[in-house]
Amino acid sequence: MSQPGKVKGQQAFVLHAQPYKETSLLVEMFTREHGRVGLVARGARRPRAGIRALLLPFSPLEVGWFGKSDIRTLSDIDWQGGLPQLAGTPLVTGFYVNELIMKLVARDDPHEGLFDDYRTLIAHLARGSVAIAPVLRRFELQLLAATGYAPTLDRDLAGEPVRADAVYGFVPGEGARPGAERGCEVSGQTLLALDHGALDQASAAVLREARFLNRALLTHALAGTELASRALLNEVAALSDN
């Protein structure tokens, strides 16, 4: 007899896991076709449970589950390999990104493009092939766009094109206005670099402005909800001048 709500062969990453009942784990996963899902990994906390070693964040997985309630049951899991484990600053960054997804992406709301963006980000973090700040800022904006909070970065509130040599005050939920009387002070150069995804060769000043602006945008989207990982990430960013 087939199990109700049976799903197989789903690309996934673990976002978070916590104890559930006596021997199980409640695992939040980000999947490509189903978005964020909550799955019970039965027996995963038993001393010799091999499945627990697979339930690590930032490892590409293929999973299956069954059930029709808000919390389903994990039935299959295979490690897809190919990425080294994160450590140091990339690890802190990864936990920060996972917490953002947990807060902003609703369960059972598919975001295939965002999943692909996340997978690309994790690959960059794991391989250390590029600087962290530009790819993290890019993903933050991709997440905001996917969840309905995309800012307009190339035009001001009057609809005029943003000028690279001007200074703006950016108010999340509204936009950019010439001058810096209100909102987050940011240069037009930074707004255009963010809009064009062109932070790879940006100056330290532009990267700092981009970090502060994105933080303001995310704070607005989170409606004041605090992130446990942000304080540590800010310390790391300050030390690295990202």
Curated annotation (Swiss-Prot):
**What GO CC terms are in its UniProt record?**
bacterial nucleoid
Q: Which GO terms describe its biological process?
A: DNA recombination; double-strand break repair
Record keywords:
DNA damage, DNA recombination, DNA repair
Q: Which domain of life is it from?
A: Bacteria
Q: What InterPro entries has UniProt attached to this entry?
A: ARFGAP/RecO, DNA_rep/recomb_RecO_N, NA-bd_OB-fold, RecO, RecO_C
A Pfam short name = RecO_C
Do you know which PANTHER family this protein is assigned to? DNA REPAIR PROTEIN RECO
According to its UniProt entry, what is the function of this protein?
Answer: Involved in DNA repair and RecF pathway recombination.
What family, per the record? Belongs to the RecO family.
What is the name attached to this protein's record?
DNA repair protein RecO
Please report the organism this UniProt entry assigns to the protein: Laribacter hongkongensis (strain HLHK9)
